[in-house]
């Protein structure tokens, strides 16, 4: 039986709420995406330069903490990923269609394979190499920050997009692209508004990311009472 999913509508108010963080604070951590995405626009930038931008963006977006193995590595581990991303530079575009799915999944697969092969060590067990905790969150954040072809699939996005527990695959990508196409008019309004406020172009998938992250964040906050307990 074919799965049915709720119709997801993007509204400008949530995007505006996300945007207000950067309007209020020009050094807000959300701005790290702009600098990373902008750096990857120029293929002539040195690999070392791009890897450093990618590392700081990931750190700013919470990927250098907790159980993430990249916490124990320096920025140069991303140089191999930069070379992979260069091959898919044609995916940097304003809008995505079902025709782009194969190439996006190829990029996802190559990045995941690359990071899965990286080992790291912890001080308390310096003789046994560990595998990086390569998650959909890490890989999609890399894709969003460099190519802009998918939103970052963290917990807040998945909650708002109704795909909790779902791994990134072709089916989920189709849903995301379909959502962006169904909300094209609103997304274009948001893009113009963002350009006016930040003087920077945001591709469609970044707008999708902003909306569903903010909605997931607000939904989570609404579940918390004043004493910090979940209703």
Annotated model-derived regions:
Residues 1-130, 148-231:
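An N-terminal alpha-helical hairpin/helix-loop-helix interaction module that forms a charged
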Residues 124-144:
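Helix-hairpin-helix
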């Amino acid at each position: 039986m074919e799965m049915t999913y709720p119709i997801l509508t993007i509204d400008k108010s949530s995007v505006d709420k996300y945007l207000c963080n950067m309007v209020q604070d020009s050094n807000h951590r959300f701005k790290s995406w702009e600098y990373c995405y902008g750096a990857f626009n120029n293929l002539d930038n040195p690999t070392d330069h791009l890897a450093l931008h990618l590392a700081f963006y990931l750190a700013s977006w919470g990927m250098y903490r907790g159980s993430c193995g990249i916490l124990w590595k320096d920025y140069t581990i991303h140089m191999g990923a930069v070379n992979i991303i260069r091959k898919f530079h044609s995916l940097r575009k304003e809008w995505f269609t079902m025709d782009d799915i194969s190439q996006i999944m190829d990029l996802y697969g190559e990045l995941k394979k690359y990071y899965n092969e990286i080992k790291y060590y912890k001080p308390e067990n310096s003789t046994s190499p560990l595998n990086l905790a390569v998650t959909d969150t890490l890989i999609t954040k890399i894709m969003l920050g460099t190519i802009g072809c998918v939103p970052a699939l963290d917990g807040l996005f998945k909650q708002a997009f109704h795909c909790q527990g779902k791994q990134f695959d072709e089916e989920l990508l189709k849903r995301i692209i379909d959502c962006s196409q169904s909300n094209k008019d609103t997304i274009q309004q948001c893009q113009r508004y963002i350009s006016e406020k930040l003087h920077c172009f945001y591709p469609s998938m970044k707008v999708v990311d902003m909306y569903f992250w903010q909605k997931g964040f607000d939904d989570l906050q609404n579940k918390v009472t004043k004493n910090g307990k979940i209703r």
